[in-house]
Amino acid sequence: MAAAGAAVARSPGIGAGPALRARRSPPPRAARLPRLLVLLAAAAVGPGAGGAARLYRAGEDAVWVLDSGSVRGATANSSAAWLVQFYSSWCGHCIGYAPTWRALAGDVRDWASAIRVAALDCMEEKNQAVCHDYDIHFYPTFRYFKAFTKEFTTGENFKGPDRELRTVRQTMIDFLQNHTEGSRPPACPRLDPIQPSDVLSLLDNRGSHYVAIVFESNSSYLGREVILDLIPYESIVVTRALDGDKAFLEKLGVSSVPSCYLIYPNGSHGLINVVKPLRAFFSSYLKSLPDVRKKSLPLPEKPHKEENSEIVVWREFDKSKLYTVDLESGLHYLLRVELAAHKSLAGAELKTLKDFVTVLAKLFPGRPPVKKLLEMLQEWLASLPLDRIPYNAVLDLVNNKMRISGIFLTNHIKWVGCQGSRSELRGYPCSLWKLFHTLTVEASTHPDALVGTGFEDDPQAVLQTMRRYVHTFFGCKECGEHFEEMAKESMDSVKTPDQAILWLWKKHNMVNGRLAGHLSEDPRFPKLQWPTPDLCPACHEEIKGLASWDEGHVLTFLKQHYGRDNLLDTYSADQGDSSEGGTLARGEEEEKRLTPPEVSHGDRDTQSVRPPGALGPRPALPESLHHSLDGKLQSLDGPGAHKEVGGAAPFLGVDFSSLDMSLCVVLYVASSLFLMVMYFFFRVRSRRWKVKHHHPAV
């Protein structure tokens, strides 16, 4: 995650933080650069600054880059098996692991007709629904998909002891061997060892191709790796045999394993001579034999090289300020994407959500519409009588499906103090760091805010709640584990709210130091010890020639920097945001004017991560859940408040607002009463007008 200070770039993951050096501060808007200069400056941010920047690039890497439109078609009923990495481009561990994944894909490139290495970015808006379908909670997640799978499956989880390249490569081989005979990829040769009798029969036969036999120990994977390396080559067959029969090996002249015994087309045979008995030497030797050449295998066409033509206008910001838009964008991603990866919540997960929302509702220093939404969510969750809830019910409330006036949370991601030089750097982790720092400061400066919540006498309330959230829900699993280790070491030593502020600051700087130079570090925002001297000169001192911190001044600075008085609403979206048909938010009108119309749509940071309409149908909920939700909405809206009429709910194919529906009901009741009154009125009058006929007496 990234430091809430906008001065130190803190890495993605629980360790990344924002750092801006003064010399790199963008020029003030007042300069009014001509459009051409603005575009040139934006392009100078780098080729990866556009929304299309990803960890893996189709056409450049050996990795098969999948998305929501291709993943099911690729893995369903495929003639090859698949190993897919579901990752998030903001995840620090995912960024650090990307070179290993690229190297793995290149290393097993020749295996592609049997098993393919792919990746899918769950951070991209278009992919979030499919990641939810595949039940992806944490990043990176590795899933195997067998060949010829006809029905939808979420795949098999990677079960290796670690994620080193060799380990993953060996588990790929195990996965291929676990295929049944009928479901094994057609291009995959048999990987089981042959018996000595089979070797003798091969020696006696002549053919039109070479036969290579790799002799190895039972625990070795080298033979199977060489077999798979030679899949795309014709005029050669590779198999393997174990070293169990020592006498047989001596007869062939095999004195050590691994060794490769080659049978030539003319019937001659013998050991091949390589410098080192390694996979690369064996495979290279066999590929270079006369008449051994690559054959044409039917492979799906991989996407062409991506062209990144997007230009993103840099949002200027003051590194000494905190921006509401960063906090609200983080809340949007947290509530609508990260938590939404869990289809339902129960037990400890539900308790963690309730406590986290309680802390947010009481301490979040943002704008009133956002605070009101958090308060509504907190009261509703607190009143639930259920032990398990579907998360779609929470989404309905967050998305304001009941159209309550006065509540709003942006459905856009837009980073300002958390923007990175590339789209996969900083962003959400930075926002989460800022949010946590802000909550610790609010708990200290407004101690009465938590009265009545059960947290009022707990100086560790924010830290422990944050700790449980990161451990339970934060997408970067490895980052969460690192944070848990730090919490176990010293979080229990926190005895006051001020100590909580300093504890989080120290741990954040510790993470900064650990991740400095990591691939997840943004070169434009290096990870430094924060606050830097230019932001807080009084925070730094020197004792006996050694630089140190003045923690008293640091505490004062943190309270000022993360205090509500330091929050700026610049760039923040309003309920009438342009994406929803209203006016532009402050700061955006000029930005739109400076951005060329033909590329203005390319800024992924300003796109909706998950529009309410894409959230899927609302599940059938228990009646008590509906009543609880409706009751809380009414109580929060107030007795005299009215519901918005701008948002309409579809009914029989026609859009009716809440007011329209209410008027229909009133009109229906009034019409029914009127008809009943008229019916009785005419019935009584008909009796009064009725003529009585008397029969004559006889």
Curated annotation (Swiss-Prot):
Residues the record lists as binding FAD: 426, 433, 437, 478, 482, 505-512, 527, 530
Region (Disordered), start-end ranges: 570-624
Record domain Thioredoxin: where: 34-178
Classification via SUPFAM superfamilies: FAD-dependent thiol oxidase, Thioredoxin-like
Glycosylation site list: 77, 178, 218, 266
Gene3D superfamilies (UniProt xref): ERV/ALR sulfhydryl oxidase domain, Glutaredoxin, QSOX sulfhydryl oxidase domain
GO biological process: protein folding
Cofactor remark from the record: Binds 1 FAD per subunit.
Molecular-function GO term, any one: protein disulfide isomerase activity
Disulphide linkage map: 91-94, 122-131, 418-430, 476-479, 536-539
Entry GO CC: extracellular space; Golgi apparatus; Golgi membrane; nuclear membrane; nucleoplasm; plasma membrane
UniProt key word Protease: no
Low complexity composition bias: residue spans: 610-622
Domain ERV/ALR sulfhydryl oxidase: 421-530
EC number: 1.8.3.2
Topological relation to the membrane, as annotated: Single-pass membrane protein
Cofactor: FAD
Sequence ranges of Polar residues compositional bias: 572-581
Keyword check for Nucleus: yes
Domain of life: Eukaryota
Described purpose of this protein according to its UniProt entry: Catalyzes the oxidation of sulfhydryl groups in peptide and protein thiols to disulfides with the reduction of oxygen to hydrogen peroxide. May contribute to disulfide bond formation in a variety of secreted proteins. Also seems to play a role in regulating the sensitization of neuroblastoma cells for interferon-gamma-induced apoptosis.
UniProt protein name: Sulfhydryl oxidase 2
Species of the source: Homo sapiens
Source lineage: Eukaryota, Metazoa, Chordata, Craniata, Vertebrata
